[in-house]
Every structure is written in structure tokens, then in C-alpha cells.
Amino acid sequence: MTAGKRVSRKAGKGVGAVIETAGEVIRTRLGHRRPRFAVVLGSGLGFFTQRMTDTVTIPYAEIPGFPATTVIGHGGELVVGKIGGKEVLAQSGRFHLYEGHEPNVAVLPVRTFAALGIETLLLTNAAGGIRRTFATGTVMLIADHINLTFRNPLTGPVQ
């Protein structure tokens, strides 16, 4: 599979091969660096990578199975660098079902991070709330959500 190509829903065992190949490409680009912490940057958090030092940037176009992002403001790259002396992998831009991606594509980066040895993952996103006390930029911890995709995220084989 070449960079940027879609991962077929019917790929089955092929998805594991895509994850392995993507991981190999990322490892090669990182050399000796092996971050253990990753953050998925949601809308409005792209600036985070600008605060990192000693960075290595890998555009999605160079990672097998990673499609281009279509959401404005989503960088479309992995950035590994240091924050407070800690090595961090930042995913700048992600893939969404509403862009036409299958669930196995939407979770491809997270599964690849696990294959890379990431031990801690922080997921961020833009979210709305019904409380009038919520203002733009309010940090929230989400305990549940309304799933309007009509897809169960728990279906499929467990690996």
C-alpha cells in the first residue's frame, strides 16, 4: 500500500500490515527517538506543535495508509518533539467518519501509536455543551456522548 491510499474496509488482516508498515516508516524517520506519550490535537490546538522543540515532522502523505486531512486547520502531519524536556508525538489533524473514512481509517493513527510503543495517549477535540456556563475554550472531561453515527464502536474483532 502506498502513502495516502485508503485502507479498505475489507482489508481484514491487511489492516495489521498497514499498521506495521506505517510504524516502520515512522520509526525510520524518528531514528533513535521513541516517544512514550502522544497527543491527538483537536480543532484549534494546532499551535501546540509550534511550542515543541527539536522537532521531526512527518507529513501524512509519507505514511502508508494515512489519508490527507480535509478539515481546515488540521495540519496533516505527525510532529515529534520535546515539551518540558519530555519527548511527545503530536498528531496534527485526524480523520473523521464525516469525511467519508471508514472507522478502521479513523483509528489507524491510534493503532499505529500503540504499535510504536506509545504508553499514554491524550485525546482532544472541539465539543459543544448544553450548559450556558460553558464558554469557548472551557476544558471539559467527557463522560458520555450522543452517538449519531448509528455505528457501534465496539463491533469487529478484538486484537
Label for each model-derived stretch:
Residues 2-159:
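Metabolite-binding pocket within alpha/beta catalytic cores that recognizes anionic/polar moieties
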